[in-house]
């Protein structure tokens, strides 16, 4: 799963984890491949205390889901150069303040000035919990958090949260809520990344899980053999992901990249109580689907570098490049009930996506201007933090 899937909102209707990202409603139009703009942008600004107006030093300022970021100087100033044009989410965070973010759609190669005034916040609760004070209940909550946040794939087995003591857990029977008082430091030795994850909210209740946060990636240093292994693993994580799909759709060659697209009308098959289709690669019996072309769901945008997804119902995606993994089929069996699909043998990786907020704009990089408009399920949603690569990643 690519990080352009925006790990902001997950819904877990028993057999599928649903993830928020951005999409639209149904129209058949002809369109061309979006143009790639020339030049780069520069982001500058000042970060201040909202109450006093004083500049804030050493504030994290970064482009979410990327490797690009910086920190403010003594005057609260920041400057990020060489930013590709298109859609980005600029995120600002400092301990003791409410984080802030702004969605950007950079269409011109120029300097953009974005100032932030952060609101002070009092962090309630106890300080860092030492190992000896973490009781059995804490360990149970943490284990559940790891499964739902890091994931249950082979890559998750090589991914470690280095500072779990910054997590705060709440919740009663069957529910779990969490947030971090400092960025989570996650080391992914499967893909070769150190990730700072700024987790604002995590909520898991029976049948539903969601979390909201922003990752900043940094490549790990490694030996020649390690770098070769990471390069292979990153390619595997990218191929078949939602970001791979978006780039293939923009290039109008989905089949060449191994994707088959189908439309399922909203009235076909069964939907869960939250208004979304059941995940896990299929609907309950009775759902109808028919093959579609990219032009059936995508139209020209306002400018030549953008396209707009626009459809009703939901799109089912079959990736012929890989079959379902054993970890995925085990996950399905674990969460499936008698009324849902069970998978006896692996099939090609199958996912769905549908609209949350109406038409959504995609830039030439495959990034969504509004990161919250689309929900995905099936294999796209099964792969979580341990399978993310930075949004600018492209296979070499």
Residue ranges and their predicted role:
Residues 41-49, 76-78, 116, 127-128:
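A short, amphipathic beta-strand motif
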Residues 41-43, 50-65:
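Short, ordered, surface-exposed loop/turn motifs in non-cytosolic proteins
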Residues 66-77:
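Short, acidic Ser/Thr/Gly-rich low-complexity loop/linker segments typical of extracellular
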Residues 63, 91-103:
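A short, solvent-exposed loop/turn motif at the edges and junctions
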Residues 118-396:
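Surface-exposed, low-complexity/disordered segments
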Residues 27-42:
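Beta-strand-rich domain onsets/edges
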């Amino acid at each position: 799963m690519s990080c352009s899937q925006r790990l902001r909102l997950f819904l877990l209707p028993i057999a599928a984890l649903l993830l928020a990202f951005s999409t639209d409603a149904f129209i058949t139009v002809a369109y061309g491949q979006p143009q790639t703009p020339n030049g780069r942008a520069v982001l500058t600004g000042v970060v201040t205390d909202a109450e006093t107006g004083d500049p804030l030093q050493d504030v994290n300022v970064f482009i979410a889901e990327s490797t690009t970021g910086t920190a403010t100087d003594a005057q609260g100033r920041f400057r990020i150069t060489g930013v590709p044009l298109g859609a980005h989410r600029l995120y600002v965070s400092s301990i003791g303040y409410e984080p802030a973010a702004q969605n950007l759609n950079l269409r011109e190669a120029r300097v953009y000035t974005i100032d932030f005034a952060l609101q002070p916040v009092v962090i309630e609760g106890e300080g860092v919990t030492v190992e000896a004070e973490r009781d059995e209940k804490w360990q149970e909550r943490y284990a559940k958090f790891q499964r739902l946040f890091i994931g249950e794939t082979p890559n998750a087995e090589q991914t470690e949260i280095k500072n779990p003591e910054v997590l705060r857990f709440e919740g009663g029977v069957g529910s779990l809520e969490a947030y971090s008082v400092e960025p989570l430091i996650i080391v992914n030795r499967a893909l070769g990344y150190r990730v700072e994850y700024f987790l604002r909210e995590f909520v898991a209740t029976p049948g539903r899980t969601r979390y909201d946060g922003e990752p900043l990636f940094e490549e790990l240093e490694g030996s020649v053999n390690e770098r070769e292994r990471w390069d292979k693993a990153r390619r595997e994580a990218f191929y078949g992901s939602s970001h791979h799909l978006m780039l293939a759709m923009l290039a109008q060659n989905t089949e060449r990249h191994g994707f088959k697209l189908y439309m399922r009308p909203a009235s076909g098959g069964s939907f869960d109580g939250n208004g979304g289709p059941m995940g896990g690669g299929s609907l309950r019996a009775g759902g109808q689907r028919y093959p579609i072309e990219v032009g059936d769901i995508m139209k020209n945008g306002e400018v030549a570098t953008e396209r707009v997804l626009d459809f009703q119902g939901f799109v089912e995606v079959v990736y012929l490049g890989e079959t379902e993994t054993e970890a995925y089929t085990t996950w399905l069996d674990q969460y499936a009930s008698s009324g849902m699909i069970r998978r006896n043998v692996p099939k090609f990786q199958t996912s769905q996506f549908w609209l949350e907020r109406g038409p959504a704009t995609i830039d030439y990089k495959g990034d969504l201007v509004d990161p919250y408009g689309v929900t995905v399920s099936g294999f796209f949603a099964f792969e979580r933090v341990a399978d993310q690569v930075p949004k600018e990643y492209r296979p070499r």
